[in-house]
């Protein structure tokens, strides 16, 4: 994700952009020195989650994909229709890695699914 795109969205839409894309917890966690970079990394995580689904072209409410900092490593918290889709596809657990540089932020999501029943 281009950090400049997130910066431009914040400049153009402000709080409306934040409320549409991020949870209150994510916004609070990003209120530091590298705010735009941290928000861009969370946006990258949301994109990575969507791509991990077998049907990534379906609509996904971005606020139902949350990056939390409950411990030393970032975690994913899914809710609503996104959590239901994950259960339907057999998601058992996930791991998340975030990083950012001057111009870009990136995320990798690894999902473990239960083994499909053989017929």
Where are these regions (language model features)?
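Core catalytic alpha/beta fold that binds nucleotide/phospho-ligands
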Residues: 1-119
């Amino acid at each position: 994700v281009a950090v400049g795109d997130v910066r431009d969205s914040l400049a153009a839409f402000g709080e409306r952009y934040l409320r549409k894309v991020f949870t209150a917890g994510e916004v609070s966690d990003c209120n530091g020195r590298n705010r735009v970079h941290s928000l861009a990394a969370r946006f990258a995580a949301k994109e990575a989650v969507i791509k991990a689904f077998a049907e990534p072209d379906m609509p996904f409410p971005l606020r139902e994909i949350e990056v939390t900092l409950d411990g030393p490593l970032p975690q994913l918290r899914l809710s609503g229709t996104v959590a239901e889709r994950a259960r339907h596809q057999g998601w058992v657990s996930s791991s998340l890695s975030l990083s950012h540089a001057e111009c870009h932020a990136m995320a990798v999501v690894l999902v473990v699914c239960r083994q499909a029943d053989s017929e």
